[in-house]
Amino acid sequence: MAMAHEPMTADALATDQGLPGKFLGVILNDLRRAGIVVSHRGREAGYNLARPASQITLADVIRALEGPLAQVRGLRPETATYQGAAKHLQDAWIAVRASLRAVLEHITIEQVATGEMAPEVAQLLADPDAWVARRLA
C-alpha cells in the first residue's frame, strides 16, 4: 500500500503481510480514524494512504495504534512523578521519549518500503551493537 496508487483491499493486505484479517481490520480502522489511510467503497474498494508515504512517519502510525510513544505506568512521562531518591527518574523517562521521537519521527513509510533510511537512522543501524539483544545477567 505504501507505494501503490490503486486501493488495496484489507484481504490483500492481510495476505501480503501474513496477518489475520480481523486483526488487520482493527488496525486499518484505527489508521483511518487517525487520518493515515482512507477507505474506498464500491468497485474500487480498498485502502490508500491519506497522504504521501514520505509524509507519514512511524511515530504517526504508533501514536494512531498505541497512543503516546512512551508511557510510564500508563502515564505520559511528564506526569509520572517520583519521590525521594527516585525523583529524577522522570528525567530518564523524558529522555527515553525524546530518543524514541528522534528515531521514529525521522523514519517515513516510504523509507520503510524502500529501505532507504535517513542518515541519522542509518548511522544508528551501522553500529554492530545496535543489533545485539541485551538480557539480564
Predicted regions and their residues:
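Beta-hairpin "wing" of winged helix-turn-helix
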Residues: 35-49
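N-terminal helix-turn-helix DNA-binding core of bacterial DNA-binding proteins
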Residues: 1-20, 48
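C-terminal regulatory/oligomerization modules of transcriptional regulators
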Residues: 78-137
